[in-house]
Regions:
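Hydrophobic alpha-helical positions that pack around
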Residues: 369
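Ferredoxin-type iron-sulfur electron-transfer modules and their immediate structural context
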Residues: 2-28, 33, 37-188
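Cofactor-cradling patches in redox/metallo enzymes
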Residues: 262-348, 376-390, 397-486
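Short cysteine clusters
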Residues: 140-148, 152, 189-195, 199, ...
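Structural motif
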Residues: 34-35, 254-256, 323-324, 366, ...
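Iron-sulfur (Fe-S) cluster-binding segments and ferredoxin-like electron-carrier domains
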Residues: 107-122, 149-169, 197-215, 299-304, ...
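Iron-sulfur-cluster electron-transfer modules
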Residues: 2-19, 159-342, 480, 485-490
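Ribonuclease/tRNase effector modules and their secretory precursors
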Residues: 471-473, 478-479, 483-586
Length: 586
């Protein structure tokens, strides 16, 4: 006690001992001080008839702050109310002025009770013993909400709750000078919206990250590098590989088939079969658009580029007579729905109306159905896919996080370009839900799962009895798009379309091909470097290995190619790239 009194004495606290508790004492104190606080024992002794306002901890006459009731929790809460009353009195306000919400309130904290066993209170006789107190305290389940963390590999990877992550993202966006250390986390989010679904309060990290990307692009704070390859791929789809034609024999069409850039890159045979089927069984003409819906630019936060892409598609649709778009990709359908003058429908709904084609695979199998991020919140698409799978005699095994709560495969939001480690963890999360083969209705999901070594198939592969390339590399994907365009132009519209060919042979070792795919170096990039080599002759030869190396600056990237000369061409044994510019000394 003496130690406590001494410590309080250093805080400008005065003590008066042996005072007689009378109303006169309270009057004297009030004349000397702005605010007087008294315990209920003092109030009952001096003013036995007084009844303080328990909500304000205040006695109007005489003006005293008091009224703490019995109990530890009541006393703690009473002290908080009394402190607020003192603050109001010190400001010459009435204690009831602008106090806000006080007392017991309904918490927004959600705590899952999955796996929690019910337990009864430890009985005690008056006071707990040490052992009893420990046992009673051990019953606490440490209430907390981590529903989003459990569901999202992105949040688990950075080990941060959304509130903290949002604050750090805000700081990253707001700083003018200094390092933007949160760029990679901002770009690693798949923007899939799963967190909003699983969060009891609907917190949406996807919206936070998307707005951050848009803001940083607009203010020039977001470098192009993390998304440049994906954006260039989108531009390729809507330039060299782009095709927009009405059905043969029609000037305008009632429908147009839009398979999306991933299906044309991974499963061109499926696109061809689906288009021929739709043309044969739908009246009014079915046009075809091979291209990208533009979501890649939207994911990258490049609003201007996204709007330019929308304008390109709108122009193509107007030339076809503004037909209903039959989409083979839920993300394309969701993106194209945002165009004011378009009407979209999923090919799965169309197949429900016209029935399955004769060559549909009728092979009973057990599958795990992975719902696409693009179909989140779209019950019609999810239900149509399940009915279509049932008609194909697929038995769908239940999985956690399905439907609207389905996780992203790692392609959405361009995660696989910005942070491959997170994208790999996302794919693993998806595949950990079942050991069965995976059935998808998004070709990007099918490709991601195949790259992780899991048997996977797109539902249209079953519908049309076709098979996609197992895991086409980035160069093969571009070749597939061009090849499909060339084939359809020749077969249906009798038009010629020629690839750009180099006048020499280029071969690749298996190691070089794998490294190029991993480093996102296209065979067309290598061809350009070697074409420039033949013009300049600039290369360095390692006489011990016989390997030469040359380089060229293409756009924002410098490519280095290791090669050996062979008959009429080159054998590429390695390649890498960087963003430094190599300039000759002046």
């Amino acid at each position: 006690m003496q130690h406590t009194l001494k410590a309080l004495g250093k805080m400008d606290v005065q003590f008066h001992f042996n005072e007689v508790l009378t109303p006169a004492l309270l009057d004297t104190l009030q004349e000397m001080q702005d605010v007087v606080c008294a315990s209920m024992d003092v109030v009952r002794t001096c003013l036995p008839e007084a009844e303080p306002d328990q909500a304000l901890m205040y006695l109007e006459s005489p003006a005293l702050v008091c009224g703490v009731t019995d109990g530890v929790l009541d006393s703690a809460f009473g002290a908080k109310k009394a402190a607020l009353t003192v603050d109001r009195l010190a400001q010459k306000l009435h204690p009831s002025n602008t106090r806000g919400e006080e007392g017991a309130v309904s918490t927004r904290l959600y705590t899952s009770l999955d796996g929690v066993s019910a337990s009864s209170q430890i009985p005690c006789d008056g006071i707990y013993s040490k052992e009893e107190a420990i046992a009673e305290a051990a019953r606490c389940i440490q209430c907390h909400c981590d529903e989003c963390i459990k569901a999202c590999p992105y949040l688990r990877h950075y080990n941060k709750f959304p509130r903290l992550l949002t604050r750090e993202i805000y700081n990253n966006v707001s700083i003018i000078m200094g390092d933007h250390v949160m760029n990679k986390p901002i770009n690693a989010c798949s923007l899939c919206g799963q967190c909003k679904v699983v969060c009891p309060n609907g917190y949406d990290m996807a919206e936070v990250c998307h707005l951050a990307r848009q803001n940083m692009v607009e203010t020039g704070k977001m470098p192009l590098a993390p998304h440049e390859f994906a954006l260039m791929d989108m531009m390729f789809s809507n330039n060299e590989a782009f095709l927009a034609r009405p059905q043969v024999g029609f000037d305008s069409c009632k429908y147009v088939f839009f398979p999306g850039c991933q299906m044309t890159a991974i499963a061109p045979a499926t696109v061809r079969a689906a288009y021929q089927d739709l043309c044969a069984r739908l009246d009014g003409g079915v046009g075809l658009i091979l291209g990208c819906c533009g979501v890649i630019a939207d994911w990258a936060g490049r609003t201007e580029m996204f709007e330019e892409n929308q304008a390109l598609l709108q122009e193509a649709l107007e030339k076809l007579g503004n037909p209903t778009i039959i989409c083979a990709c839920p993300t394309c359908q969701k993106t194209l729905d945002g165009m004011a003058t378009t009407k979209t429908v999923g090919i799965w709904q169309t197949l429900e109306e016209i029935g399955l084609p004769e060559n549909a695979l009728d092979a009973p199998r057990v599958v795990a159905l992975h719902d696409s991020c693009g179909a989140r919140g779209d019950a019609d698409t999810q239900d149509a896919i399940r009915r279509l799978a049932e008609k194909l005699h697929c038995e769908i095994t239940p999985t956690v996080y399905d439907g609207d709560a389905s996780p992203c495969c790692g392609y959405g939001g361009l995660t696989q370009y910005a942070n491959r480690e997170v994208a790999h963890e996302m794919a693993e999360m998806c595949l950990s839900r079942s050991d069965a083969p995976y059935l998808t209705y998004c070709m990007a999901c099918r490709d991601r799962f195949a790259r992780e070594g899991r048997e996977s198939m797109h539902i249209l592969e079953l519908v049309y009895g076709t098979s996609a390339d197992h895991c086409p590399d980035i160069s093969q994907k571009r070749y597939n798009r061009l090849g499909l365009k060339q084939q359809l132009l020749s077969e249906l519209w009798e038009e010629e379309f020629a690839f750009m060919n180099v006048p020499f042979d280029i071969e690749y070792t298996e190691e070089a091909a794998r490294a190029m795919d991993d480093r996102m170096i296209l065979k067309s990039d290598v061809a350009q470097v070697l074409t420039l080599l033949r013009e300049t002759g600039e290369a360095v030869l390692d006489e011990e290995t016989g390997i030469s190396i040359t380089r060229a600056r293409l756009g924002n990237v410098t490519f280095w190619v290791k090669y050996k000369e062979i008959d009429n061409g080159y054998l590429v044994v390695g390649a890498y790239s960087h963003r430094m510019n190599i300039a000759p000394r002046k």
